[in-house]
Amino acid sequence: SAASDVYKRQMFVVGNQAAVDTWGDYCYDLTGTPIAGELTTDAYNLYDADGKLCSIGYCYECYGIIVNEDLLEKAGYTLGDITNFETLKAVAEDIHARASELGFDAFTSSSMSDDSSWRFTGHLANLEYYYESVDDPDAWKECPSSIKGTYMQNYKNLWDLYINNSAVNPADLAAGGFDAADEFGKEQAVFYQNGSWEWAKLTGTGDGQYGLDNLSMIPFYCGVAGEENAGLNCGTENCWAVNALSLIHIS
Protein backbone atom coordinates (compact mmCIF):
# COMPACT_ATOMS: atom_id res chain seq x y z
CA SER A 1 0.00 0.00 0.00
CA ALA A 2 1.00 3.63 -0.29
CA ALA A 3 0.96 3.92 3.49
CA SER A 4 3.69 1.29 3.77
CA ASP A 5 5.69 2.81 0.89
CA VAL A 6 5.30 -0.31 -1.25
CA TYR A 7 4.46 2.03 -4.12
CA LYS A 8 4.59 5.76 -4.64
CA ARG A 9 1.72 8.00 -3.68
CA GLN A 10 0.39 8.98 -7.09
CA MET A 11 -3.38 8.40 -6.85
CA PHE A 12 -5.57 10.24 -4.41
CA VAL A 13 -9.25 10.73 -3.65
CA VAL A 14 -10.50 14.19 -4.60
CA GLY A 15 -14.13 13.60 -3.87
CA ASN A 16 -16.08 16.84 -4.14
CA GLN A 17 -15.99 20.30 -5.64
CA ALA A 18 -14.49 21.83 -2.51
CA ALA A 19 -11.59 19.38 -2.76
CA VAL A 20 -11.14 20.28 -6.43
CA ASP A 21 -11.00 23.96 -5.46
CA THR A 22 -8.28 23.12 -2.93
CA TRP A 23 -6.23 20.53 -4.81
CA GLY A 24 -7.15 21.07 -8.45
CA ASP A 25 -3.80 22.63 -9.34
CA TYR A 26 -2.11 19.35 -8.41
CA CYS A 27 -4.51 17.14 -10.37
CA TYR A 28 -3.44 15.64 -13.67
CA ASP A 29 -5.93 16.32 -16.46
CA LEU A 30 -7.62 12.98 -17.07
CA THR A 31 -9.34 14.13 -20.26
CA GLY A 32 -8.76 11.62 -23.06
CA THR A 33 -7.13 9.01 -20.81
CA PRO A 34 -8.03 5.32 -21.14
CA ILE A 35 -9.95 5.35 -17.86
CA ALA A 36 -12.02 8.33 -19.00
CA GLY A 37 -12.77 6.45 -22.21
CA GLU A 38 -14.27 3.57 -20.24
CA LEU A 39 -16.94 5.74 -18.64
CA THR A 40 -20.58 5.48 -19.65
CA THR A 41 -21.56 8.74 -17.92
CA ASP A 42 -19.92 12.03 -17.07
CA ALA A 43 -22.21 12.55 -14.08
CA TYR A 44 -19.68 11.63 -11.41
CA ASN A 45 -16.61 13.40 -12.78
CA LEU A 46 -15.24 16.57 -11.20
CA TYR A 47 -13.84 19.50 -13.18
CA ASP A 48 -12.06 22.68 -12.20
CA ALA A 49 -13.12 26.15 -13.30
CA ASP A 50 -11.08 25.83 -16.51
CA GLY A 51 -12.71 22.56 -17.52
CA LYS A 52 -9.86 20.26 -16.51
CA LEU A 53 -11.03 16.77 -15.59
CA CYS A 54 -9.54 16.52 -12.10
CA SER A 55 -11.06 13.32 -10.75
CA ILE A 56 -13.19 10.41 -11.90
CA GLY A 57 -15.80 8.55 -9.88
CA TYR A 58 -14.78 4.91 -9.49
CA CYS A 59 -17.88 3.71 -7.67
CA TYR A 60 -21.17 5.22 -6.64
CA GLU A 61 -24.09 4.51 -4.36
CA CYS A 62 -27.82 4.71 -4.93
CA TYR A 63 -30.57 5.15 -2.41
CA GLY A 64 -34.35 5.29 -2.37
CA ILE A 65 -37.09 2.99 -1.10
CA ILE A 66 -36.14 -0.70 -1.06
CA VAL A 67 -39.07 -2.96 -1.91
CA ASN A 68 -39.64 -6.61 -1.00
CA GLU A 69 -41.40 -7.71 -4.18
CA ASP A 70 -42.49 -11.05 -2.70
CA LEU A 71 -44.42 -9.29 0.06
CA LEU A 72 -45.75 -6.74 -2.40
CA GLU A 73 -47.18 -9.54 -4.52
CA LYS A 74 -48.67 -11.25 -1.47
CA ALA A 75 -50.53 -7.99 -0.87
CA GLY A 76 -51.90 -8.14 -4.41
CA TYR A 77 -49.61 -5.67 -6.16
CA THR A 78 -46.60 -5.59 -8.46
CA LEU A 79 -43.82 -3.06 -8.77
CA GLY A 80 -45.46 -1.77 -11.93
CA ASP A 81 -48.42 -0.57 -9.87
CA ILE A 82 -46.21 2.05 -8.21
CA THR A 83 -45.20 4.88 -10.54
CA ASN A 84 -45.62 8.06 -8.46
CA PHE A 85 -46.59 9.31 -5.01
CA GLU A 86 -50.29 8.83 -5.58
CA THR A 87 -49.92 5.13 -6.40
CA LEU A 88 -47.31 4.57 -3.67
CA LYS A 89 -49.67 6.13 -1.14
CA ALA A 90 -52.61 4.00 -2.26
CA VAL A 91 -50.60 0.78 -2.04
CA ALA A 92 -48.98 1.63 1.30
CA GLU A 93 -52.21 2.67 2.95
CA ASP A 94 -53.99 -0.46 1.76
CA ILE A 95 -51.21 -2.71 3.06
CA HIS A 96 -51.19 -0.89 6.40
CA ALA A 97 -54.95 -1.25 6.72
CA ARG A 98 -54.64 -5.01 6.14
CA ALA A 99 -51.46 -5.53 8.19
CA SER A 100 -53.08 -7.93 10.66
CA GLU A 101 -54.47 -10.03 7.83
CA LEU A 102 -51.27 -9.98 5.77
CA GLY A 103 -48.81 -10.52 8.60
CA PHE A 104 -46.64 -7.55 7.59
CA ASP A 105 -46.94 -3.77 7.33
CA ALA A 106 -46.15 -1.21 4.66
CA PHE A 107 -43.07 0.63 5.98
CA THR A 108 -40.35 -0.23 8.45
CA SER A 109 -39.91 2.06 11.45
CA SER A 110 -38.49 5.54 10.88
CA SER A 111 -36.59 5.94 14.12
CA MET A 112 -35.16 9.36 14.94
CA SER A 113 -32.22 7.96 16.90
CA ASP A 114 -28.76 8.93 15.64
CA ASP A 115 -28.17 5.59 13.93
CA SER A 116 -31.30 6.01 11.80
CA SER A 117 -32.30 9.67 11.50
CA TRP A 118 -29.63 10.44 8.88
CA ARG A 119 -31.79 8.57 6.39
CA PHE A 120 -34.43 11.27 6.68
CA THR A 121 -32.56 14.41 7.72
CA GLY A 122 -29.94 13.75 5.05
CA HIS A 123 -30.99 11.45 2.26
CA LEU A 124 -34.73 12.15 2.21
CA ALA A 125 -34.09 15.88 2.49
CA ASN A 126 -32.10 15.70 -0.73
CA LEU A 127 -35.32 15.56 -2.73
CA GLU A 128 -35.89 19.21 -1.78
CA TYR A 129 -32.39 20.20 -2.85
CA TYR A 130 -32.53 18.21 -6.07
CA TYR A 131 -35.80 19.61 -7.34
CA GLU A 132 -34.77 23.15 -6.41
CA SER A 133 -31.57 22.65 -8.42
CA VAL A 134 -33.63 21.47 -11.39
CA ASP A 135 -35.71 24.65 -11.20
CA ASP A 136 -32.69 26.95 -10.89
CA PRO A 137 -29.40 25.25 -11.87
CA ASP A 138 -27.36 28.45 -11.69
CA ALA A 139 -28.25 28.94 -8.03
CA TRP A 140 -26.89 25.48 -7.25
CA LYS A 141 -23.49 25.64 -8.93
CA GLU A 142 -22.32 25.97 -5.34
CA CYS A 143 -24.22 25.17 -2.16
CA PRO A 144 -26.61 28.10 -1.59
CA SER A 145 -26.80 29.80 1.79
CA SER A 146 -30.51 29.04 2.05
CA ILE A 147 -33.24 27.07 0.33
CA LYS A 148 -36.57 28.30 -0.99
CA GLY A 149 -38.54 25.44 0.52
CA THR A 150 -40.52 24.91 -2.66
CA TYR A 151 -40.76 21.17 -2.16
CA MET A 152 -40.91 20.92 1.63
CA GLN A 153 -44.55 19.89 1.49
CA ASN A 154 -43.56 17.02 -0.81
CA TYR A 155 -40.89 16.03 1.71
CA LYS A 156 -43.48 16.13 4.50
CA ASN A 157 -45.99 14.12 2.49
CA LEU A 158 -43.55 11.27 1.99
CA TRP A 159 -42.36 11.40 5.61
CA ASP A 160 -45.97 11.30 6.83
CA LEU A 161 -46.61 8.33 4.58
CA TYR A 162 -43.70 6.50 6.20
CA ILE A 163 -44.67 7.09 9.81
CA ASN A 164 -48.43 6.66 9.43
CA ASN A 165 -48.21 3.33 7.61
CA SER A 166 -45.86 1.39 9.87
CA ALA A 167 -46.28 -0.97 12.82
CA VAL A 168 -44.60 1.62 15.06
CA ASN A 169 -46.61 4.43 16.63
CA PRO A 170 -45.29 7.77 15.29
CA ALA A 171 -45.25 9.13 18.84
CA ASP A 172 -42.62 6.55 19.79
CA LEU A 173 -40.13 7.30 17.02
CA ALA A 174 -38.24 10.04 18.85
CA ALA A 175 -37.28 7.60 21.61
CA GLY A 176 -35.39 5.35 19.18
CA GLY A 177 -34.62 1.74 19.90
CA PHE A 178 -35.96 0.41 16.61
CA ASP A 179 -34.10 -1.62 13.99
CA ALA A 180 -35.55 -0.98 10.54
CA ALA A 181 -33.04 -3.28 8.81
CA ASP A 182 -34.03 -6.17 11.05
CA GLU A 183 -37.72 -5.47 10.52
CA PHE A 184 -37.22 -5.53 6.77
CA GLY A 185 -34.90 -8.53 6.86
CA LYS A 186 -37.48 -10.50 8.83
CA GLU A 187 -40.13 -9.52 6.27
CA GLN A 188 -42.20 -7.45 8.66
CA ALA A 189 -42.59 -4.65 6.10
CA VAL A 190 -42.68 -4.16 2.33
CA PHE A 191 -40.85 -0.82 2.11
CA TYR A 192 -37.56 0.30 3.67
CA GLN A 193 -35.79 3.56 2.92
CA ASN A 194 -32.08 2.93 2.52
CA GLY A 195 -29.42 2.39 -0.12
CA SER A 196 -27.37 -0.01 -2.18
CA TRP A 197 -24.89 -0.45 0.69
CA GLU A 198 -27.54 -2.61 2.42
CA TRP A 199 -27.49 -5.19 -0.39
CA ALA A 200 -25.00 -7.60 1.17
CA LYS A 201 -26.73 -7.59 4.54
CA LEU A 202 -30.20 -8.07 3.10
CA THR A 203 -29.35 -10.72 0.50
CA GLY A 204 -26.41 -12.56 2.04
CA THR A 205 -26.74 -15.85 3.87
CA GLY A 206 -24.02 -15.48 6.50
CA ASP A 207 -24.29 -14.51 10.14
CA GLY A 208 -26.33 -11.36 10.60
CA GLN A 209 -27.64 -11.50 7.02
CA TYR A 210 -31.18 -12.15 5.87
CA GLY A 211 -31.09 -14.06 2.58
CA LEU A 212 -33.76 -12.05 0.78
CA ASP A 213 -33.69 -12.58 -2.97
CA ASN A 214 -36.44 -10.54 -4.63
CA LEU A 215 -35.67 -6.91 -3.88
CA SER A 216 -35.96 -3.75 -5.93
CA MET A 217 -35.56 -0.05 -5.25
CA ILE A 218 -37.85 2.79 -6.27
CA PRO A 219 -37.24 6.56 -6.19
CA PHE A 220 -38.49 8.98 -3.55
CA TYR A 221 -41.91 9.51 -5.09
CA CYS A 222 -43.22 12.66 -3.44
CA GLY A 223 -45.80 14.19 -5.77
CA VAL A 224 -43.59 16.29 -8.06
CA ALA A 225 -44.82 16.68 -11.63
CA GLY A 226 -43.14 14.21 -13.98
CA GLU A 227 -41.78 11.98 -11.22
CA GLU A 228 -42.93 8.93 -13.16
CA ASN A 229 -39.67 9.38 -15.06
CA ALA A 230 -37.52 9.91 -11.96
CA GLY A 231 -34.54 7.71 -11.19
CA LEU A 232 -32.81 6.71 -8.00
CA ASN A 233 -30.70 9.12 -6.00
CA CYS A 234 -27.10 8.37 -6.98
CA GLY A 235 -23.85 9.98 -6.00
CA THR A 236 -20.31 9.48 -4.79
CA GLU A 237 -17.34 11.10 -3.14
CA ASN A 238 -15.19 8.17 -4.26
CA CYS A 239 -13.28 9.89 -7.05
CA TRP A 240 -9.76 9.12 -8.17
CA ALA A 241 -7.29 11.86 -9.00
CA VAL A 242 -3.69 11.53 -10.17
CA ASN A 243 -0.98 13.78 -8.78
CA ALA A 244 0.39 15.65 -11.80
CA LEU A 245 3.65 16.39 -9.99
CA SER A 246 4.33 12.70 -9.45
CA LEU A 247 4.08 12.15 -13.21
CA ILE A 248 6.65 14.88 -13.77
CA HIS A 249 9.02 13.13 -11.39
CA ILE A 250 8.41 9.78 -13.08
CA SER A 251 9.12 11.16 -16.53
Model-derived segments and spans:
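Hinge/lid segment of periplasmic solute-binding proteins
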Residues: 13-67, 119, 125, 214-219
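Extracytoplasmic/periplasmic substrate-recognition and gating elements
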Residues: 73-75, 206-251
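Short helix-initiation/N-cap motifs at beta->coil->alpha
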Residues: 1-4, 85-87, 172-185
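Extracytoplasmic/periplasmic solute-binding protein
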Residues: 54-58, 63, 89-143, 189
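Alpha-to-beta junction loops
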Residues: 5-12, 186-194
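Short, small-residue-biased leader/transition segments that mark boundaries at the very start
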Residues: 2-7, 250
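Glycine-centered hinge/linker elements that transmit conformational signals in sensory
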Residues: 92-93, 137-174, 220
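A ligand-binding cleft/hinge motif common to bilobed small-molecule-binding domains
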Residues: 18-22, 196-211
